[in-house]
């Protein structure tokens, strides 16, 4: 426990009985780390500031702060140690395989980081004259060329900052195209039952009604159900390919034909592009818009190492409706056209973000493309699919593949039928994986598979690491079937924090730290 009674480490059940309970609460290098606010101390800041003799005048009146806001004061070494110790409590791709399905948690090459830190990219500002950032603009142009070439699409919007933001961009372009054609009455978007949750959420955000398309027993779009729901009220269909069951939509060309025949557009969720990059061009399949997660397929960092980036490629029909700015190349070099009036052929719906997108991610993704080349990117897809099928093949006798017939694509999907009668749930199994040193796979998604366990190893894992992961899962599966429920119900035992009480977390959430009431500032 820390000084406010919050559990900060696992309780070692046998430590006290064996005389191994430590006096401080720490366990070797597993430090008992408090919140940074709890480390606060008077006059501990690492910077000396000159005294203020008189407060500057202010027009804030009643808004002027009259009490401290509770920011912690720490010295520089205390601050550094705090965050380093916290980092040691987290799993990361730099520690072990990170099998989150539909997330493509591949290695982030250090060469990319070196390139992104070149002063010509890292020290520029989006408001400085464009004549002084020609190198950065040229890199954006080259990245756009690669994205268009790999997808077979004629246009790309670089500025969307994540996958869902890319979905928003694509649907706004689709809405603008329909309105320009006098088809503003089309207010429905179709999406499969296995779709990413962001698909219906984005469609609803744009103002569309979402209608689900049924899935066949083999995990793919039901063409008959799709055809029955198409009509002049439908604006678009949103399909992930490969889909979230880890399967390629074999009827994708027919899906596109039916959609276009009904006057609608085909939006492809490109979250799983890593499985087909260099092998399949979505534009050749009839796709009208697709976002590409640079932080998945093209290895730019996830999460705290981010930010994300989700450029959107567009078909010839949607290209005129791409958001500003547009990158052009003329007598004065590369320029960003900021207004729709700058090009009479375009009728943009506006901007997707301030400035020009995630420049650091552009550099990393472009470095990744250059280091692989076209043949290397093709091998990326092949190895990603190979690794997923190796896991599926090695686990199919102890776990239950959701779709056992035929190969999967980049991720292997299992259901929980193999756990029936064991008293162990998908959640229990995932928590036990933490004790074995692995981040859990994606759980309970897609929703169409009961107790889903979605495993995506990516192409950057060696056979040795895959075998280590497989051995851990086989051992856990054996323990579950042998009735060792205690191993699972209490897991994780060896993580910095134990399992939360989910009922209390839902009913009485503590979402922010609340400081002790501060005394008013002393008047001068």
Swiss-Prot record:
GO-annotated molecular function: glycine binding; glycine dehydrogenase (decarboxylating) activity; pyridoxal phosphate binding
Superkingdom in the source lineage: Bacteria
Cofactor: pyridoxal 5'-phosphate
Leading EC class: oxidoreductase
KW Nucleotide-binding (keyword) present: no
Reaction equation(s) it catalyzes: N(6)-[(R)-lipoyl]-L-lysyl-[glycine-cleavage complex H protein] + glycine + H(+) = N(6)-[(R)-S(8)-aminomethyldihydrolipoyl]-L-lysyl-[glycine-cleavage complex H protein] + CO2
Subunit annotation: The glycine cleavage system is composed of four proteins: P, T, L and H. In this organism, the P 'protein' is a heterodimer of two subunits.
Entry function: The glycine cleavage system catalyzes the degradation of glycine. The P protein binds the alpha-amino group of glycine through its pyridoxal phosphate cofactor; CO(2) is released and the remaining methylamine moiety is then transferred to the lipoamide cofactor of the H protein.
PANTHER family associated with the record: GLYCINE DEHYDROGENASE (DECARBOXYLATING), MITOCHONDRIAL, GLYCINE DEHYDROGENASE, DECARBOXYLATING
This protein's name: Probable glycine dehydrogenase (decarboxylating) subunit 2
Organism, as annotated: Caulobacter vibrioides (strain ATCC 19089 / CIP 103742 / CB 15) (Caulobacter crescentus)
Gene from which this protein is expressed: gcvPB
């Amino acid at each position: 426990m820390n000084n406010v009674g919050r559990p900060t480490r696992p309780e070692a059940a046998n430590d006290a009985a064996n005389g191994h309970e430590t006096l401080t609460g720490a366990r070797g290098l597993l430090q008992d780390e408090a919140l940074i606010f709890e480390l606060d101390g008077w006059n501990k800041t690492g910077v000396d500031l000159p005294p203020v003799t008189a407060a500057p005048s202010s027009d804030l009146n009643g808004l002027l702060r009259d009490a401290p806001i509770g920011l912690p004061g720490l010295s520089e070494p205390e601050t550094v140690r705090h965050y380093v110790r916290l980092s040691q409590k987290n799993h990361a791709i730099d520690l072990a395989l990170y099998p989150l399905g539909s997330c493509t948690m591949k290695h982030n090459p250090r060469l990319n980081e070196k390139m992104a830190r070149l002063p010509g990219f890292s020290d520029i500002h989006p408001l400085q004259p464009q004549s002084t950032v020609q190198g950065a603009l040229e890199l954006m142009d080259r990245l756009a060329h690669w994205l268009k070439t790999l997808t077979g699409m004629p246009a790309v919007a670089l500025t969307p900052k994540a996958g869902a933001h890319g979905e928003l961009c694509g649907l706004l372009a689709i809405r603008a195209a329909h309105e320009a054609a006098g088809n503003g009455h089309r207010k429905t978007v179709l999406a499969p039952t296995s779709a990413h949750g962001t698909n219906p959420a984005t469609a609803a955000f744009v103002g569309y009604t979402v209608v689900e398309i049924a899935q066949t027993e083999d995990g793919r779009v039901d063409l008959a159900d799709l055809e029955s729901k198409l009509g002049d009220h439908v604006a678009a269909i949103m399909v992930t390919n490969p889909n979230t069951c880890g399967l390629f939509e074999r009827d994708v060309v027919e899906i596109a034909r039916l959609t276009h025949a009904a006057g609608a557009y085909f939006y492809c969720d490109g979250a799983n592009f890593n499985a087909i990059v260099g092998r399949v061009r979505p534009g050749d399949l009839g796709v009208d818009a697709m976002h590409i997660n640079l932080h998945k397929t093209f290895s730019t960092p996830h999460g705290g190492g981010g930010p994300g980036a989700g450029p959107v490629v567009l078909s010839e029909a949607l290209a005129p409706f791409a958001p500003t700015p547009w990158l052009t190349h003329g007598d004065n070099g590369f320029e960003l056209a900021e207004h729709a009036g700058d090009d009479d052929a375009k009728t943009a719906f506006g901007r997707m973000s301030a400035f020009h997108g995630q420049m650091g991610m552009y550099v990393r993704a472009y470095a990744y493309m250059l280091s692989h080349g076209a043949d290397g990117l093709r091998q990326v897809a092949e190895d990603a699919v190979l690794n997923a099928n190796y896991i599926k093949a090695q686990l199919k006798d102890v776990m239950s593949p959701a779709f056992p017939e035929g190969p999967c694509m980049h991720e292997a999907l299992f259901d929980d039928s193999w756990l029936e009668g064991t008293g162990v749930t998908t959640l229990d199994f995932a928590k036990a994986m933490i004790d074995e040193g692995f981040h859990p796979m994606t759980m309970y998604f897609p929703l169409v598979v009961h107790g889903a366990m979605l495993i995506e190893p990516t192409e950057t894992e060696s056979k040795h690491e895959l075998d280590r992961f497989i051995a851990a899962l086989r051992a856990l599966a054996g323990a579950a079937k042998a009735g060792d429920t205690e191993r699972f119900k209490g897991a994780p035992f060896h993580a910095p924090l134990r399992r939360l009480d989910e009922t209390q977390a839902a009913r009485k959430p503590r979402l922010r730290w609340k400081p002790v009431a501060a005394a008013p500032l002393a008047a001068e």
